[in-house]
């Protein structure tokens, strides 16, 4: 934990599998003096993704370890997190399911952002399914991670209106915009009470 302006900053880890757009907004928000966290570690299950480049550009430790199918590699990741005093794991476009033993090690301290208004549209291809079902609204959900897919306790949701002109791409852009706004603030709020 780092002390800044008399406040303690909690170390967080961000897990991702791709472009890292949420990572970028989380880092930017965390750099404000009065915020409660610092991105200390980034873990990706894929090599050569933009998210790892964003981490390196911001001098954040980053690792490419596809650990979800190997307990040995999972323990390696847990050791990295422990060594860096990680208080919260934030999944941001992490496209793997965490093993039960891993979730148990950080019980109540892993959150995820999902691009739908859960419990509707768990899993992949949410925007296409929203259009197919003629939904009037969609949005994003931040929730605690448990052993079931996109089923943990909901922390916060934000919705956006769907118009007749919307496509899955335009909906993705709308939802991503609100994700970038609420995810960093929600992380800060959770850590402010730890």
Language-model-derived ranges and their functions:
Residues 1-194:
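One-carbon transfer enzymes
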């Amino acid at each position: 934990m780092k002390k800044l302006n008399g406040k303690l900053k909690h170390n967080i880890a961000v897990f991702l599998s791709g472009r890292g757009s949420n990572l970028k907004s989380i880092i930017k928000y965390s750099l404000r003096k009065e915020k409660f966290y610092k991105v200390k570690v980034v873990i990706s299950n894929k090599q050569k993704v933009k998210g790892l480049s964003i981490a390196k550009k911001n001098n954040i430790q980053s690792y490419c370890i596809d650990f979800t199918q190997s307990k040995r590699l999972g323990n390696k990741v847990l050791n990295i997190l422990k060594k860096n005093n990680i208080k919260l794991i934030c999944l941001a476009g992490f496209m793997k399911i965490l093993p039960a033993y891993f979730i148990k090690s950080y019980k109540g301290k892993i959150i995820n952002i999902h691009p739908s208004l859960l419990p509707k549209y768990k899993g992949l291809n949410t925007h296409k399914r929203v259009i197919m079902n003629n939904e009037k609204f969609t949005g994003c959900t931040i929730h605690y991670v448990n052993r079931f897919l996109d089923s943990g306790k909901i922390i916060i949701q934000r919705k956006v209106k769907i118009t007749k002109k919307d496509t899955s791409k335009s909906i993705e852009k709308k939802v991503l915009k609100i994700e970038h706004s609420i995810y960093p603030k929600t992380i800060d709020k959770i850590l402010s009470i730890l």
